[in-house]
Each structure stands twice: as structure tokens, then as C-alpha cells.
Regions:
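Nucleic-acid nuclease catalytic cores
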Residues: 34-47, 54-86, 108
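Domain-level recognition of nuclease-like catalytic cores that cleave nucleotide substrates
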Residues: 73-127
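Alpha-helix C-cap/termination motif
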Residues: 16, 59-62, 100
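Conserved catalytic cores of phosphodiester-cleaving nucleases, focusing on short active-site segments
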Residues: 11-43, 56
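A short acidic/basic microdomain associated with nuclease active sites
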Residues: 1-6
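Residues at the starts of beta-strands that form the adenosine-phosphate
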Residues: 21, 65-67, 103
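A general structural detector for well-ordered alpha-helical segments in enzyme core domains, enriched
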Residues: 52-55, 93
Length: 127
């Protein structure tokens, strides 16, 4: 369920663990691919996405487990990267989030009329 957190955000998935170590999971949809076999996010400047990275950083600093999951809706890719040239601020905030322990994952998905299936984990390429 979406739960409010931070200054003015809602998390996509919140896991309330009885031991007190909660998990905050933000999910991003990815469709951009400008280079062979490489998927990228974001496809435009995203101040909201940057805000989410900073909010996750704060939650991680407080001892929570935080995850950013990129669901790549393309079958022609094997890798994922932050599109630094499209949104420098998002890229810099992703570095801050990594520094504070936010976990990043990217998964390739198969999109059909029946739904979206997660296929496999993608390698994340650092810029």
C-alpha cells in the first residue's frame, strides 16, 4: 500500500516489519533505450524522482531498509543505467542515495495484454 513518508511523499510499497526495521520500496517504470541493449532512466527531467531519492536517503539514514526498483518494460536490453545527460540532478541524488544505503535493482519485464511479468535482473552500469 502507498504510505506517506518524509516531507511530502508517498512510497509505492511499505513493509512494516515487527522488528522495527521497516522497508520502503519505490518503483519506477523504464521505457527509454538510446543505445544497444541499454535501458535508461529518467527519459526527461524528474524533480519528483529526485525528491524520492532524497526521501529514501533520509529513511535509510534512520535505519530503515530502502529500495529503488526500476522495471524495464523492454525485451531488447541487458543493462540499465541512470541517464545522467538527461537529468544531472537525478543522477547526483542517486549517488547520495547509494551513499546512504539505498539499494538499487533493475529488472527486465515482458509486457503483454494479460499483464507484466518480471523476467530477470539487469546489470546496473555506473556512469
Amino acid at each position: 500500500k502507498e504510505v506517506k513518508y518524509g516531507k511530502n511523499s508517498r512510497i509505492d510499497i511499505f513493509v512494516d516489519n515487527p522488528d522495527g526495521e521497516n522497508s520502503y520500496i519505490e518503483v519506477k517504470s523504464v521505457t527509454l533505450s538510446r543505445y544497444k541493449q541499454l535501458s535508461e532512466f529518467p527519459d526527461s527531467i524528474t524533480s519528483r524522482g529526485s525528491k524520492h531519492l532524497l526521501e529514501l536517503s533520509e529513511m535509510s539514514k534512520k535505519g530503515n531498509k530502502c529500495y529503488l526498483i526500476y522495471l524495464v518494460q523492454r525485451s531488447d536490453v541487458t543493462k540499465f543505467s541512470i541517464a545522467k545527460d538527461i537529468d544531472q540532478e537525478y543522477y547526483e541524488n542517486s549517488l547520495i542515495a547509494k551513499k546512504y544505503g539505498v539499494n538499487f535493482f533493475a529488472y527486465k519485464c515482458n509486457v503483454t495484454k494479460k499483464g507484466i511479468d518480471i523476467l530477470n535482473k539487469l546489470e546496473i552500469i555506473e556512469n
